[in-house]
Amino acid sequence: MCIRDRDKYLGTEELNLILREEIAGLLSEINSGNDSEFSLTSNHKPYVIMVVGVNGAGKTTTIGKLAHQFRKQGYKVVLGAADTFRAAAIDQLQVWAERVEVPIVKQNMGSDPASVAFDTLESAVSNQADVVIIDTAGRLHNKVNLMNELTKIKRVMHKVVPNAPHEILLVLDGSTGQNAFEQAKQFTAATEVNALAVTKLDGTAKGGVVIGISDQFQVPVKYIGVGEGIEDLQVFNKMEFIDSFFKK
């Protein structure tokens, strides 16, 4: 029976229940978590997060807010400024590091990103940090360049922390619709993305892109950005997210 036919027999509550089940199915078991706290999901120390995504998606802001949340939970955090293609990227991460009071490892613009990642992990190990968050370049000329750059960074990380990075977090702008799909396609093809952070889901952006991207690429959504404030990065809660579509 199609939904149009079911309209004759089902009320609003029944239809909402069907829609909830459909959305839950699209988000799939990979988004089964109902956590609300920022916590580490592994015993690796340091736990290394490599953050990827295009410039303008909210990558640096997400890193800063993530560092803030982990620090609030009592974790010792180190940032690595491995987006060395833009001076602004290094400067912006420095501002966030100062704001949330965590150390940052950086070099000059044009430096080898893999070298920055190596230095960051060495610093984290020597200082017994719990979490390392590495920023990476958002724009390379093509997918091959992107893949080569990220592969090199990972290879160098392995020399310091054998299984690093433990998480490759792709940051997507939830308000850009089809562009977010294209970015997800590019980055999931270039490296082993295993978590998503979807930003700018406040205002008119309703978050439908979250459902489509998670379903198509089979990568769990881990964080959502719902505003400009430092506290406006949330751990993705599947049931709360689905409920938000049905609030009156």
Question: For the regions a protein language model found, what residue spans apply to each?
Answer:
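Nucleotide/phosphate-binding catalytic cleft detector across ATP-hydrolyzing
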Residues: 1
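Conserved catalytic-core segment of NTP-binding enzymes
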Residues: 92, 113-127, 141-247
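Residue-level signal for short, function-critical loop segments
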Residues: 83-84, 174
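Short glycine-rich anion-binding loops that position phosphate/pyrophosphate groups of nucleotides
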Residues: 137-139
